[in-house]
Amino acid sequence: MCDEFEKRQIELTYYTSAEKDPCFEQNYKYVKPEFIGEGNMAFVRLNMLSAGVVLMTTPGLQVYQLKRSKNVKHYSHVLHMPNDATTYRLFGLDYFDSVLLTGDYQKTDLQYLENARNITKKELVTVGCSYLDILAEKIKSIPEEDNHNFTVLVSPSWGSVGVLSKYGEKLLDPLAKTGWNIIIRPHPQSKKSEKEMLDRLEARYKDNANIVWDYERDNIYSLKKADIMISDFSGIIFDYTFLCDKPVIYVADYIDLRPYDAYDLGKELWQFETLKKMGIKLDENNFENIAEVIKNASDSKELSEQRKIAKETAWMNIGNAGKNIVDFMIQKEESLSKKEGK
C-alpha cells in the first residue's frame, strides 16, 4: 500500500508502534512514517487524529482505549489475514465505517452481526490480501536447495491452545527422533508471553543438530523449505497453504470463542471448517507414531483440491490488494470532500 502511494506521488502519513518498522528503511519521498510509541502513548496520539480517511489494522475502535476522533471523517479497517473477520475480541469491527476484506466470504458473518446487534451498516469491500501478495513475490525469488532433506515445520499459535505450550516435549521428542530436519517457528508473541517455556525447550534440544529454531521476521524461508507443516489453528496455516500448496497436519483443540465476535455467530467458523477439509488431523495419542503419520500423509487429489478452493475463497484479487486499497482510500476522500463542497 505504501509503495502504491509512493508510485502515485500522493502524500501519506504512516503511524506505527514499531520502532524498527520496515517502512523507515524504504526512504520514501511521499510516504511519511512516524513512530508514535506503544500502549497508552500511541492511543493518546491516535485519539487526536485529524484526517479525511484513516486506515487501520488495529481493531477495537470505540471499545476500549482507541476512540474515534471528531476530526476524522472516515475510519476504515483493513484485514491483514485471510481467515474469518470475526476472530477479533468482541465488537472489534463494529464502529468502523468500512472494512476492507481479503475475500467475499467474510461479508456474510459481518453482515449477520450488524443485523443481530442493530448497528450501523459498514461498507464491506473486497480488496485482497496485501501481505500475501508481497510474500508471494518474495518466495518466488528464493532459490531451491541443491541437496534438500525432508523438512517438517512446526509453527503454532501462542497461549494455552498452542501446540508448543500445551504439548511441548510430547510432540517434539518423537519429531526429533525421526532424523528429519525440524524447523520450530514459535509465534512472535511467544517470545514475550511464553519465554520460560521456549527457554526450556531450546535447552532440551540444544544438542539436536536436526532441530532449528526460527525467530526471523520473515517466515517465507521456513515456509519454502518445509515439505509439511504441523500447527494448531494458527493463521500461518493459510500462509503456507496459499503460498506453497503443500499438506498441513493440525492438532485440534477446543477454543473458547466467548471473548470473540465469532461466538455470537452460533456456527462453526469458515477457517475451522476449511481446515478439516484441507488438513490432516493429528491426535495426541498418535504423537509417538508421528513418523508414520507424516509418511502416510500423502498429498491426495482431494486435499489439493480443497486447498485450491480455500485459496480462491479467502485470497481474492491476487496481486492487486495494494492498488485496490489505495483506490478505495482516494475515492473515499474525494467523495467526502465533494459532500462538503470542497
Q: Which residue ranges define each predicted feature?
A:
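Short acidic-hydrophobic, aromatic-tinged amphipathic segments that line or gate anion-handling sites
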Residues: 33-39, 211-215, 277-286
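Conserved catalytic-core segment of nucleotide-activated headgroup transferases in glycan assembly
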Residues: 1-13, 130-201, 280, 284-287, ...
